[in-house]
Each structure stands twice: as structure tokens, then as C-alpha cells.
UniProtKB/Swiss-Prot annotation:
A zinc finger (RING-type) spans 53-98. Zn(2+) 3 binds at C75, H77, C94, D97. GO terms for molecular function: cullin family protein binding; molecular adaptor activity; NEDD8 ligase activity; NEDD8 transferase activity; protein-containing complex binding; RNA polymerase II-specific DNA-binding transcription factor binding; ubiquitin protein ligase activity; ubiquitin protein ligase binding. CDD domains: mRING-H2-C3H2C2D_RBX1. The modification N-acetylmethionine is found at M1. Belongs to the RING-box family. One of its GO terms (cellular component) is Cul5-RING ubiquitin ligase complex. This is E3 ubiquitin-protein ligase RBX1. GO terms for biological process: cellular response to amino acid stimulus; cellular response to chemical stress; cellular response to oxidative stress; cellular response to UV; DNA damage response; MAPK cascade; negative regulation of canonical Wnt signaling pathway; negative regulation of insulin receptor signaling pathway. The gene is RBX1. It catalyses: S-ubiquitinyl-[E2 ubiquitin-conjugating enzyme]-L-cysteine + [acceptor protein]-L-lysine = [E2 ubiquitin-conjugating enzyme]-L-cysteine + N(6)-ubiquitinyl-[acceptor protein]-L-lysine; S-[NEDD8-protein]-yl-[E2 NEDD8-conjugating enzyme]-L-cysteine + [cullin]-L-lysine = [E2 NEDD8-conjugating enzyme]-L-cysteine + N(6)-[NEDD8-protein]-yl-[cullin]-L-lysine. Widely expressed. Pathway: Protein modification; protein ubiquitination; Protein modification; protein neddylation.
Amino acid sequence: MAAAMDVDTPSGTNSGAGKKRFEVKKWNAVALWAWDIVVDNCAICRNHIMDLCIECQANQASATSEECTVAWGVCNHAFHFHCISRWLKTRQVCPLDNREWEFQKYGH
């Protein structure tokens, strides 16, 4: 439970010197988050980047969301790790900007 908060009154008022204007009894904070990427979909399989890739969807019995991670390149493009790995078997470039692919990070 949050502690009571003292609130200063404006210096020009004389109403109730020393009294609190209000007291916070309870505060329920809410926070939201989002990935810091512009594109929400994997450009290779077209699924949402936070959903399973098409390979994991086909093998849903054995796949978990922990296994289907996101991979970022130094170009800041993001793909499912399985999708970009399959792509890199034939071409060593980013599918979106054609620059040489280099992993920046991967994982959730």
C-alpha cells in the first residue's frame, strides 16, 4: 500500500495552513511495453514477429514459443530465427535491404 503524500499548497493561498490538500490512499500503476521495431511482421513468413513462424506452426506438437525466437541484424531488421536461418542457407544478405547479413542479437 502506498504511503500518504504531502502536497504543497501554492504560496499565495491562506486556506488551511498546514493541512494536506489531498491524501493518496491507494495507487494502482499500470505499465505497457512494446518492441522497439518498426515492422511487426517477419518479412520472410509474413507472420507476426511475436507469433510462431510457419516452421514452428507446422510442428506445433514439438515447438514452443521459447524455441521460436526473433533475430535482429546489424541493419535493425528483425525476422524469426528459423526463417532467417533458412534464408541464409542460400543467400548471405538481409532479405529487405540486400546488405551482407550479420546477427546483432537474437532471442526474446
